[in-house]
């Protein structure tokens, strides 16, 4: 209803203004006939005097954000901001280095796997694989055992009638040692990481051989004392 009343009022005002303009035009024509000089000046004045009716405009503006004045930060805040920037840059550099190292590690692993596979293929193409470290160790143990048995036989031949018994005991102890087994102690190494158990096996074999030597020496010393007492 209020909008309708406002529209009616504006229409009434326009009609009244149009009527006034028509009356002014009639007066201008009449005055122009009597006073021709004042005609254009009067029309200019009337054009400047014309005004349209103003309407009330409602500004539908909501409560906007409260803007604060931008101030320069304090020196303490500036120091904190600089420290935060340096920490961010350092963390970014560290993360980049870590990513690069991980990528290089994966590349190295892939390259080593490819090399190992190529070596295996070449060995299969050539025929029988070369002797591994475990096989070499077993051969060395057998050679040491043969040398010990030969030396013991010589000593037993020189010592007298009890040589056969001592020889039999030494053979039994030699056969009980792990060096006499034909199976390898360690599986053939496929990469450099398998060398550690091979070294541990070698050390174990050395300890066992030392114990065997001590036992043989003890038996020999006991047999010598017995033979001397009997003589």
From Swiss-Prot:
Highest taxon, organism lineage: Eukaryota
Segments carrying motif D-box 2: 53-56
Keyword Ubl conjugation tagged: yes
Post-translational modification remark: Ubiquitinated by the anaphase-promoting complex/cyclosome (APC/C) complex in the presence of FZR1, leading to its degradation by the proteasome during mitotic exit. However, degradation is not essential for normal mitotic progression within a single cell cycle.
Pfam families for this protein: RCS1
Keyword Lyase (UniProt): no
Name under which the protein is recorded: Protein PIMREG
Taxonomy of the source species: Eukaryota, Metazoa, Chordata, Craniata, Vertebrata
């Amino acid at each position: 209803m209020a909008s309708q009343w406002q529209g009616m009022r504006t229409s009434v005002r326009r009609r009244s203004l149009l009527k006034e303009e028509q009356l002014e035009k009639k007066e201008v024509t009449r005055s122009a006939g009597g006073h021709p000089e004042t005609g254009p000046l009067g029309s200019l004045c009337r054009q400047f005097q014309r005004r349209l009716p103003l309407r009330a405009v409602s500004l539908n503006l909501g409560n906007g954000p409260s803007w604060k004045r931008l101030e320069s930060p304090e020196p303490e805040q500036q120091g904190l901001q600089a420290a935060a920037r340096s920490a961010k840059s350092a963390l970014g550099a560290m993360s980049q280095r870590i990513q690069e190292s991980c990528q290089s590690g994966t590349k190295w692993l892939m390259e080593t796997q490819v090399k190992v596979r190529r070596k295996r293929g070449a060995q299969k193409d050539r025929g029988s694989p070369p002797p591994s470290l475990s096989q070499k160790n077993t051969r060395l143990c057998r050679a040491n055992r043969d040398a010990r048995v030969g030396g013991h036989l010589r000593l037993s031949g020189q010592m007298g009638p009890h040589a056969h018994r001592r020889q039999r005991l030494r053979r039994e102890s030699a056969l009980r040692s792990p060096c006499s087994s034909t199976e390898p102690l360690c599986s053939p190494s496929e990469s450099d990481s398998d060398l550690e158990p091979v070294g541990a096996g070698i050390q174990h074999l050395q300890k066992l051989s030392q114990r065997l030597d001590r036992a043989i020496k003890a038996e020999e010393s006991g047999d010598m004392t017995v033979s001397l007492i009997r003589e």
